[in-house]
């Protein structure tokens, strides 16, 4: 079935994302808000075992009872959890045990789908699990990025792509009339509860930039003293800046001889002027927008602007395989 094929593809893609990593990489935790790759691999499996297999598989037996606590994240309704800041201490189970756990649950779930594939409630649970796992695919990469950024060897998760060659287009503005607009999920496909219901909201007229802010533009903000000017920052953002001694984006580094390098999943690379700036905090993005004489768009403004392009904006299931760093759209520089 289509659902069975999607299940296999999503699970295989998670394994593919982990494939370039060593067992040591998969166990490390760089900060309390991050999780080890091994934990992501196990937790996404725990989700299917707990919420799909346990209530639906005849004679259900857990792969390993202790995993119910170790790999629960925050689902209080199904029991206790291992403390998030201590996930990096889980040197056991070994990575090989977690991969065996994944294989076991996958085989059992596919057998369940073969028997009960027309069960609408079961289909909905599996779909939720797939959406959940795809979220963790993104989290896995962001956690690897933070982990590798703290390594003095500056390791690359993937070989560097060719640099962006096209010059950036002049920033222009696309105007929107605003008014009463429909937002929220309104189709028959999957949605999370916070995307519902579809409803009407009022938007004042607004405009969006025709391309992303690039690294050269953000470097100009830094050069102009952007991190030293309190009038550009929200009060909470300025407090964060001072408390953490923030002087530039998290993954930017001073290059020998001047200028900047930017650390990413392709390792440490020279700043690419026309490449989109990424990995900013909300406070940094807000301060830049104020410096540039603009502001950040609201969620509703983004949704209304993107709605006519929705089919083209849907990422293919293997998008993270083809491109793991933000890039400018064709023709925009």
Question: What is the role of each PLM region?
Answer:
Residues 10, 37, 44, 98-101, ...:
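Hydrophobic (often cysteine-bearing) scaffold residues that line and stabilize catalytic clefts
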Residues 129, 133-135, 139, 143, ...:
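Functional-site microenvironments in short loops/helix caps that host divalent-cation chemistry
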Residues 221-223, 234:
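Short Gly/aromatic-enriched secondary-structure transition segments
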Residues 1-26:
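N-terminal regions that are enriched for targeting/export leaders
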Residues 6, 73-120, 124-128, 209:
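Acidic/histidine-rich alpha-helical segments that form the ligand environment
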Residues 82-92, 115-118, 196-202, 260-275:
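Short glycine/proline-rich turn/loop motifs
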Residues 24-80, 115-162, 166, 174, ...:
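Short, contiguous alpha-helical
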């Amino acid at each position: 079935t289509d659902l069975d094929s999607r299940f296999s593809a999503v699970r295989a893609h998670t394994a593919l994302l982990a494939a370039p990593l060593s067992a040591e990489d998969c166990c490390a935790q760089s900060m309390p808000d991050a999780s080890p790759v091994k934990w992501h691999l196990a937790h996404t499996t725990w989700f299917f075992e707990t919420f799909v297999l346990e209530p639906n598989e005849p004679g259900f037996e857990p792969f390993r009872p202790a995993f119910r606590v170790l790999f629960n994240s925050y689902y209080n309704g199904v029991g206790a959890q291992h403390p998030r800041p201590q996930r990096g201490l889980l040197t056991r189970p070994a990575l090989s045990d977690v991969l065996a756990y994944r294989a076991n649950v996958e085989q059992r779930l596919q057998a369940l789908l073969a028997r009960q594939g027309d069960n609408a409630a079961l289909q909905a649970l599996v779909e939720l699990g797939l959406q959940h796992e795809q979220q963790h695919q993104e989290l896995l990469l962001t956690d690897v990025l933070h982990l590798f950024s703290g390594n003095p060897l500056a390791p690359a998760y993937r070989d560097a792509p060719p640099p962006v060659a096209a010059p950036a287009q002049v920033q222009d503005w696309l105007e929107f009339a605003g008014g009463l607009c429909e937002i929220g999920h309104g189709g028959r496909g999957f949605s999370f509860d916070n995307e519902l219901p579809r409803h009407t909201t009022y938007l004042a007229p607004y405009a969006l930039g025709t391309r992303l802010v690039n690294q050269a533009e953000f470097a100009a903000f830094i050069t102009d003293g952007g991190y030293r000017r309190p009038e550009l920052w929200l009060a909470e953002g300025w407090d964060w800046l001072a408390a953490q001694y923030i002087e530039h984006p998290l993954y930017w580094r001073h290059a020998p001889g001047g200028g900047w390098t930017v650390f990413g999943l392709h390792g440490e690379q020279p700043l690419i002027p026309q490449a989109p700036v990424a990995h900013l905090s909300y406070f940094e993005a807000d301060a830049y927008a104020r410096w540039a004489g603009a502001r950040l768009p609201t969620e509703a403004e983004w949704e209304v602007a993107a709605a006519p392009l929705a089919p083209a904006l849907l990422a293919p299931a293997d998008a993270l395989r083809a491109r793991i760093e933000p890039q400018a759209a064709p023709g925009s520089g």
